[in-house]
Amino acid sequence: MSEYITTYTGLHFRPTEPDSDLIRIQDIAHALSLICRGNGHVQTFWSVGEHICCAKEAAARGFSERMILACLLHDASECYLSDVPAPFKKELPEYQERENRLLSMIYKKFLGSDLSEEEQIQLKEIDRAMLWY
């Protein structure tokens, strides 16, 4: 079994040993446009990519450009790790640690730093508000 995934742009990315130099916005956008929310348990195909457009909600609330971009990136780790249903994910602490580490790396790459505690709270509010939109 391979230790890496070949991304849309042809890079060999190791999800267990992520390298920020191999993270490409094109890979994130492409993969998230093809991953279905809710493990496919939705009435019609609804991609993670469509869900992250909750950035519109951040803009409507008058949040900063940084928070709008954070909304676009908040599920970016799923392009490398897939989407694990929340009830199951709660039972996988090591997965959560790896996902958080990768997401932190993505935020640092595209935002310049990780999210502050206040920004994380704002993001969760928007994510929950847009859960089914």
Predicted regions and their residues:
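Metal-dependent phosphohydrolase cores
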Residues: M1-Y133
